[in-house]
Amino acid sequence: TRHLIDMVWHRQMKKIKEAFKKMDYETALEGEREALEWITNHKGQFGHFIGGKFTKPKNLFKTINPFNRKEIAKISQGTLTDIKNSVDAARSGLKKWQALSPFQRSRYLYAIARYIQKESRTISVLESIENGKSIRESRDIDIPLAARHFYYHAGWAQLLDEEFENYSPVGICGQIIPWNFPLLMLAWKVAPAIAAGNSVILKPAEQTSLTALYFAEICKRIGLPAGVVNVVTGDGVTGSHMVNQKEISKIAFTGSTEVGKEIKKITAGSGKKLTLELGGKSPFIVFDDADLDSAVE
């Protein structure tokens, strides 16, 4: 028996040494099947999510896999009419949402968090094929963190009456997010907004809209009151339409400094509350004497 154990150990060590020499990567355990099936179920085309329903896809543009440059799906370009419809839906949803107690609202946030955990493998693959980041980053960091944000703010929602006495919700929040952390950035913005009793209109980056649309479907599955969360896809023109809506009480924007300056000019004197997170970068400095394999990891 001891001899057999030694043989197995030496074989494994030989494999490990060979692996370090080659530095090849095995295929990730996560496959694309479930994510692609979800896209296929929508016939490869997506409308906006307004008032608890997906609209008919129109004014379509392609979303591309940055790894192989192949088309993943077609997304709708949001128009001024779409934004106005989402404002109407958010206004209606706001009344229903604020009629609930903070504790009742927290139960929806907990449900969202649990659903993200349940669907984390599919969401991770969807984010990786659309954003281009490694599956390890989306699976082990971004998506679990997104779920944790909803858990965290669900807890705060339960304590609103005790810890935030005399505070009141802002109202309708317009939120614009970039492509680098699609679902995590969504969680950063949506979770605290709805926990505090607001309704939301979210515009994801045009390059990475699929996880936001998947999130919208989660909201529908858990029975979140219609209009509390709305997702309108499109480019900067769509975002501009949103910023100019008088009924939107707060704009939260993450993106370039140039666009942030324009938003500040547009909203100046309007009474809108404004949160700007501008010009963020994720630099990685590698010198010529670095271990390149470790740097890639």
Positions of PLM-derived features:
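Short beta->alpha connector loops at strand-helix junctions that form conserved
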Residues: 198, 203-205, 233, 254, ...
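Glycine-rich loop-to-alpha-helix module at the N-terminal edge of alpha/beta enzyme cores
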Residues: 69-160
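ALDH superfamily catalytic-core signature
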Residues: 258-297
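A structured beta-alpha segment of the ubiquitous adenosine-cofactor-binding alpha/beta core
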Residues: 230-249
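Periplasmic-binding protein-like
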Residues: 191, 250-254
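Residue-level signal for inorganic ion chemistry
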Residues: 52, 69-70, 105, 127, ...
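Terminal low-complexity tails and localization/encapsulation signals of metabolic enzymes
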Residues: 1-74, 107, 111, 144, ...
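Conserved small-residue-rich beta-alpha loop and adjacent elements
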Residues: 155-226
